[in-house]
C-alpha cells in the first residue's frame, strides 16, 4: 500500500512539473534582444522560423516622450506591430503617428496615456486589441479606418473626453 501511495505521489509530481513547464512562456535570447530607437525600444522577430528576422516590433516607449513617430522600418525591417502595453502610462505623450506597415495595435498599447490627444490609425491596421486606448483622458475624437475589422473589448474604456468616433460598418 505504501508503495502505491509513493508511486502515485511521484507520478503526480511529474505530471504537475510537465503541466507547469508546458504553460511557461518560451523565448530565446535573440527574440528578446531589446534595442533603442530614439524614444522607442524594439525587438526584431523571425515570423517564419527560417532563422532570419522578418520584422520589428515596438515594445516600449520612454515615459517622458511627448510626440512619437513610429518609423515604418528599423534596421531595414518593417515595423508591423506594437507589443501589448508598449506605450502604457506614457502620461506626457500627446500625439503619435503610426506608419502603414503596422497591422495591429496591441492590448493596452496606449492605455493610461492621459495626455494623448491625437493618433492616426493607418489603413494597414486590421485589429485594435482590448484596452488599446483605455484611460486616454485627452482623446477627443478618433477615426477608425475601413481596414479595421475587429475592435476588442474595452478598446476605448474610460476615454472620458471622447466625443466623436467613426467606426466602419464591417467592425465586429
Language model regions located:
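Structural signature of tandem-repeat unit edges
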Residues: 41, 63-80, 91-104, 113-127, ...
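Acidic, glycine-anchored loop motifs typical of Ca2+
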Residues: 47-53
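Sec-dependent N-terminal signal peptides of Gram-positive bacterial secreted proteins and lipoproteins
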Residues: 6-26
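Consensus positions within tandem repeat domains that build extended binding/scaffold surfaces
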Residues: 83-86, 106-111, 129-134, 152-157
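N-terminal secretory signal peptides that target proteins for export/translocation
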Residues: 1-5
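Sec-dependent signal peptide cleavage junction
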Residues: 20-38
Amino acid at each position: 500500500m505504501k508503495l502505491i501511495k509513493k508511486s502515485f505521489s511521484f507520478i503526480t509530481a511529474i505530471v504537475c512539473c510537465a503541466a507547469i513547464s508546458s504553460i511557461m512562456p518560451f523565448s530565446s535570447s535573440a527574440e528578446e534582444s531589446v534595442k533603442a530607437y530614439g524614444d522607442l525600444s524594439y525587438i526584431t522577430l523571425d515570423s517564419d522560423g527560417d532563422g532570419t528576422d522578418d520584422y520589428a516590433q515596438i515594445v516600449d516607449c520612454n515615459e517622458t516622450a511627448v510626440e512619437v513617430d513610429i518609423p515604418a522600418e528599423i534596421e531595414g525591417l518593417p515595423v508591423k506591430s506594437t507589443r501589448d502595453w508598449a506605450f502604457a502610462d506614457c502620461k506626457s505623450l500627446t500625439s503619435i503617428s503610426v506608419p502603414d506597415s503596422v497591422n495591429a495595435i496591441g492590448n493596452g498599447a496606449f492605455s493610461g496615456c492621459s495626455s494623448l490627444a491625437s493618433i492616426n490609425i493607418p489603413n494597414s491596421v486590421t485589429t485594435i486589441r482590448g484596452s488599446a486606448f483605455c484611460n486616454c483622458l485627452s482623446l477627443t475624437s478618433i477615426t477608425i479606418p475601413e481596414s479595421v475589422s475587429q475592435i476588442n473589448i474595452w478598446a476605448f474604456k474610460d476615454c472620458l473626453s471622447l466625443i466623436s468616433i467613426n467606426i466602419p460598418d464591417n467592425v465586429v
